[in-house]
Amino acid sequence: MSACQTPVIVALDFPTREAAMRLADQLDPKLCRVKVGKELFTSCASDIVEALRGKGFDVFLDLKFHDIPNTTAMAVKAAAEMGVWMVNVHCSGGLRMMAACREVLEQRTGPQPLLIGVTVLTSMEREDLAGIGLDIDPQVQVLRLAALAEKAGMDGLVCSALEAQALKAAHPSLQLVTPGIRPAGSAQDDQRRILTPRQALDAGSDYLVIGRPISQAADPAKALAAVVAELA
């Protein structure tokens, strides 16, 4: 059973193990989970997951796998064997790819990570989608991919909080993981479709990914506590 008692996931967006662990040392695994992304994992490989789990953290491995079905499924299996709590793949990889990932996890014994689909990145707006041949609103594409993910047996979705309400209404069984969360008064940085933590939960998000407002705070533990207090 997870020790974490909140929906907060802190993004460890750092280039080195030392920097990531320095922040982790200031955080309480009862108050947050942690996310390991491409930069940190490429630098440290599975060692960083092992180190974070050793400190009691649930780890969200945010590598957004996207490849042919067998290759993606084997990557998801490797993540599960690493002991991660959550792993994600791009829904745009298609139904067969997502279903292969679901199947490989069901064939394993022991704890299973949550299998999450990535819909439309929170940095993308309509003009960005048009640039890759999809001349539709991001919300429309999100709903299309969500239906595909549910059909494939995914546990949930990564989505903007602005899509959460519609997704919960259409797919109530899917758990929603929302990046781009910025506490009131924080800079937007490179996220575009954002809400505050309280707004995101009220909209239907189940987990909230928060990066710089905590990781770059003068006192990360205090910043985390403030977010948790906002959600109480």
Curated annotation (Swiss-Prot):
One of its GO terms (molecular function) is orotidine-5'-phosphate decarboxylase activity. The active site is at residue 64. Keywords: Decarboxylase, Lyase, Pyrimidine biosynthesis. Signal peptide: none annotated. SMART domains: OMPdecase. It is an enzyme of class 4 (lyase). PROSITE patterns: OMPDECASE (PS00156). Pfam families: OMPdecase. GO terms for cellular component: cytosol. GO terms for biological process: 'de novo' pyrimidine nucleobase biosynthetic process; 'de novo' UMP biosynthetic process. Gene3D superfamilies: Aldolase class I. Pathway: Pyrimidine metabolism; UMP biosynthesis via de novo pathway; UMP from orotate: step 2/2. Substrate binds at residues 13, 35, 62-71, 122, 182, 191, 211-212. It catalyses: orotidine 5'-phosphate + H(+) = UMP + CO2. Its EC number is 4.1.1.23. It comes from the Bacteria. HAMAP family: OMPdecase_type1_B. Catalyzes the decarboxylation of orotidine 5'-monophosphate (OMP) to uridine 5'-monophosphate (UMP). Belongs to the OMP decarboxylase family. Type 1 subfamily. Homodimer. This is Orotidine 5'-phosphate decarboxylase. It comes from Pseudomonas syringae pv. tomato (strain ATCC BAA-871 / DC3000). The lineage of its organism: Bacteria, Pseudomonadati, Pseudomonadota, Gammaproteobacteria, Pseudomonadales.
